[in-house]
Amino acid sequence: ISAADPSSAPAAWSKAGLLVVALCFAINMVDGMDVVIMSYIAPALGRDWGVAPDAMGVVFSAGLAGMAIGGIFIAPLADRLGRRKIILAALALMSVGMMASGFVASLWQLVAARVLVGCGIGTVLAAMAALAAEAAPQGRRDMAVGIVQAGYPLAAVFTGLIAAHMLPIWGWQKLLLVAGAATVIMLPLTWMILPDRRVTADDQPAGPAFGALMAADLRARTLLLWVAVFTGLMVLYFIVSWIPKLSIEAGLSETNGIYAGALYNFGAFVGTMSMSMLSTRFPLGRIIPAFLLSSGVAMMIFGSVSMSVPLTLLVAFVIGVTLQGGYNGMWPLAAAIYPEACRATGIGWAVAIGRGGAVIGPLMGGYLMASGTSLTLLFAAYCVPLVLCAAAAFLAGRLVSAQQQA
């Protein structure tokens, strides 16, 4: 069944469908909390254990590696065993990993725990996008998947505020346990709310799951999606990882640099919600490039124009709106690319491919900054993958539109 086939979608919103989308939004908030909390506790953990920044980078990379493993090896099982079972299993992995993180006694124990958490997150990201698309009416699928994605940046804002106030009081171990408890709470809610849709032989992909993505009718769209998510996450993770430091380089104080990071994440939430609403009126293949190219303009202004503190913070907010708002449109686009029988597999592979860009982006940025590259040249360099991302999304969107009109 095609993602665009009206026969595979409910005719209108149902209470059950709205509840499923709301639950997926909440789960994605927990995902966001479990990911970004490490960046907030890293300085305290480093002081307590005497961990050097490069060793701390191993912890961050462990989470990304886990996401790739979950996306490639676990998420495709959702197409064979059903969304509900795999989401519950992934939440269980995340719960074990997060709770274990609060009791670890060494860096390598923490690395192992973060791999578990990453496996769960990579799985959930793919399965939830597929589930939200299938719970929504045909004309609201892109909006539903986009709304679910908005949970992640919203969680980043709240997690930062909570960490800023409670880290000095609780310490980093208790913060990890609180995040783990929030993940555990999602298990019974998911068990009660998500429908237990049985997977029939007709629903399952014929032949190897990966082979379905490379079938003649999907190959071009799959490769374009991979280019888009890889190059998009190169830029996105560069900004997310370095925006406080980049803001300081642009002339802000350390405190205002932290505010710039918070405003970026709030902008990401606003942008993702805006993209979701716009997707009901305009094709994603046009909205995503418009957002991403606008973010390139904002990035160049941020890196090359001397501005007052309020204006600099405003531009950081605009980058969040346009960059992450545009990038998060990739997941409803991915849900539209693949038929139901291989949707979780397709999105899972896209999640995994994107993690490669997520690793390379911050590393390249750190190297360029260490070599003394100016902010203007630095942002110009990242506009190259940004334009590639926009072009790939545009072409993939055209192929989806052509299929829907066929």
Predicted regions and their residues:
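Cytosolic juxtamembrane N-terminal segment immediately preceding the first transmembrane helix
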Residues: 1-33
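Extracytoplasmic gate region of multi-pass secondary transporters
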Residues: 38-39, 217-272
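Helix-breaking motifs and short loop linkers at transmembrane-helix boundaries and internal kinks
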Residues: 50, 82, 103-109, 137, ...
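Conserved MFS/SLC helix-loop-helix module at the cytosolic interface between two early adjacent transmembrane helices
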Residues: 69-107
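Paired small-residue
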Residues: 93, 97, 108-116, 310-318
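Cytoplasmic helix-loop-helix junction between adjacent transmembrane helices
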Residues: 113-150
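Helix-loop-helix hairpin linking two adjacent transmembrane segments in secondary transporters
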Residues: 147-192
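C-terminal membrane-cytosol helix-exit motif in multi-pass small-molecule transporters
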Residues: 181-200, 389-397
